[in-house]
Amino acid sequence: MTETRTYATGKRKTAVARVFLSPGTGNIKVNQRPADDYFVRETSRMVMRQSLELLELLDQFDVSATVVGGGHSAQAEAMRHGIARALCELDPERRPSLKRAGFLTRDARKKERKKYGQPGARKRFQYSKR
């Protein structure tokens, strides 16, 4: 018995999602918990499901993911990225539509570090001319 289970990694900010995709009924688990329990905000749930909804495959795959780091929003986007990559690995013909929607693009924006001699990354201390 060979189970067709596909693995992919999705990232966003400091969140990393290890996503396992297998044929099923649309059951989504995040860190061994149902996705609806893990993601409290409806927008996070919507973001996470976007790549499956785009291809109308929401009820054809079971998703199991382990997510670490970042906040809930970044974790949801990391899952979306991972699910999209796993779907491409299963069927390369899905790639153009996922790429067009921007789900395969790694969002490289991260928090800019604080610099010494100033209170934040960009903010400067008040300057007095006189």
From Swiss-Prot:
It comes from the Bacteria. Transmembrane segments: none annotated. Residues 111-130 have a biased composition (Basic residues). SUPFAM superfamilies: Ribosomal protein S5 domain 2-like. One of its GO terms (biological process) is translation. The keyword Cell membrane does not apply. Pfam families: Ribosomal_S9 (PF00380). Keywords: Ribonucleoprotein, Ribosomal protein. GO terms for molecular function: RNA binding; structural constituent of ribosome. InterPro entries: Ribosomal_Su5_D2-typ_SF, Ribosomal_uS9, Ribosomal_uS9_bac/plastid, Ribosomal_uS9_CS, Ribsml_uS5_D2-typ_fold_subgr. Residues 98-130 are annotated as: Disordered. The keyword Ribosomal protein applies. Disulfide bonds: none annotated. PROSITE patterns: RIBOSOMAL_S9 (PS00360). One of its GO terms (cellular component) is small ribosomal subunit. Belongs to the universal ribosomal protein uS9 family. HAMAP family: Ribosomal_uS9_B. This is Small ribosomal subunit protein uS9.
